From Swiss-Prot:
Catalytic activity, reaction form: L-glutamyl-tRNA(Gln) + L-glutamine + ATP + H2O = L-glutaminyl-tRNA(Gln) + L-glutamate + ADP + phosphate + H(+); L-aspartyl-tRNA(Asn) + L-glutamine + ATP + H2O = L-asparaginyl-tRNA(Asn) + L-glutamate + ADP + phosphate + 2 H(+)
Name of the protein this chain belongs to: Aspartyl/glutamyl-tRNA(Asn/Gln) amidotransferase subunit C
Top enzyme category: ligase
Keyword Nucleotide-binding: yes
UniProt KW Ligase keyword: yes
Enzyme Commission number(s) of this protein: 6.3.5.-
HAMAP family: GatC
Function: Allows the formation of correctly charged Asn-tRNA(Asn) or Gln-tRNA(Gln) through the transamidation of misacylated Asp-tRNA(Asn) or Glu-tRNA(Gln) in organisms which lack either or both of asparaginyl-tRNA or glutaminyl-tRNA synthetases. The reaction takes place in the presence of glutamine and ATP through an activated phospho-Asp-tRNA(Asn) or phospho-Glu-tRNA(Gln).
């Protein structure tokens, strides 16, 4: 049985910016241990004859030609922009 310690739960909670009381830490420790035990059952499967896959479905990317098309003019594109300069839309800074 995989045992997830209370310290491990507290560490993960800290990384996730979660505040857990002692009761919640105890409960999460038990639940996470049970989840890992359940997942470890996959190690018992014989997968020697299973071909490795990267995707469950056999889908492939369907690409189209990259062809230039007639689009709206730069003037029309900037017409509804609240602020623009030198042909480009200006937006508020998000970095300090």
């Amino acid at each position: 049985m995989a045992e997830i310690s209370k310290d491990q739960v507290k560490h993960v909670a800290h990384l996730a910016r979660l505040e857990l009381d002692d009761e919640a830490v105890e409960k999460m420790s038990d639940e996470l241990s049970a989840i890992i035990d359940f997942a470890e059952q996959l190690n018992e499967l014989d997968t020697d004859s299973v071909e490795p896959t990267t995707h469950v479905l056999n889908l492939k990317n369907v690409m189209r030609k990259d062809e230039p098309k007639k689009w709206i003019s730069q003037e029309d594109a900037l017409r509804n922009a609240p602020d623009h300069k030198d042909g480009q839309i200006r937006v508020p800074s998000i970095l300090e």
